[in-house]
Amino acid sequence: MKLAVVFLLTTVVFTLAQSQCENCADLQCNSTVHCCLVSTVRLPRWKREISRCGRLAIRRWRCEEPNSNGIYNRNCPCVPGLECREFRRGRRICLPEQSSTSTSSTQGPITSSTVTTQSEATTETETTTAAEGK
């Protein structure tokens, strides 16, 4: 019975791997929508690496950081416009890219001499108007 289950599992894994993308080992996945995923199947006295084309991760999918060789273990990198960031407990997911111009940490501290309150602005306007009216 165990042998039959192992045989069935092996057959399913090979069929899935070949039907996904036969040329992934040669890095011929369509890089605009796919990445190359390489997984290792281990059975008693047998080990095999299976390559397949996986879909690029979209928002909130698990992801891996882009690398130089284009081969990934479990998850593909994010589609353009998203970035792979740590979410919880070491999990990384695709989230919108953070714009560096919108962060307030890049701005310098505000000094008291540069702060103008609403009442000061109103008083200054009234003084200017009265001076022009003379």
Swiss-Prot record:
Coiled coil: none annotated. Disulfide bonds join 24-35, 29-53, 63-84. Residues 99-134 have a biased composition (Low complexity). Keywords: Disulfide bond, Knottin, Secreted, Signal, Toxin. Its main location: secreted. It comes from the Eukaryota. Residues 97-134 are annotated as: Disordered. It is found in: Secreted. One of its GO terms (molecular function) is toxin activity. GO terms for cellular component: extracellular region. Expressed by the venom gland. Residues 1-19 form the signal peptide. The presence of a 'disulfide through disulfide knot' structurally defines this protein as a knottin. Belongs to the neurotoxin 32 family. This is U34-theraphotoxin-Cg1a. The lineage of its organism: Eukaryota, Metazoa, Ecdysozoa, Arthropoda, Chelicerata.
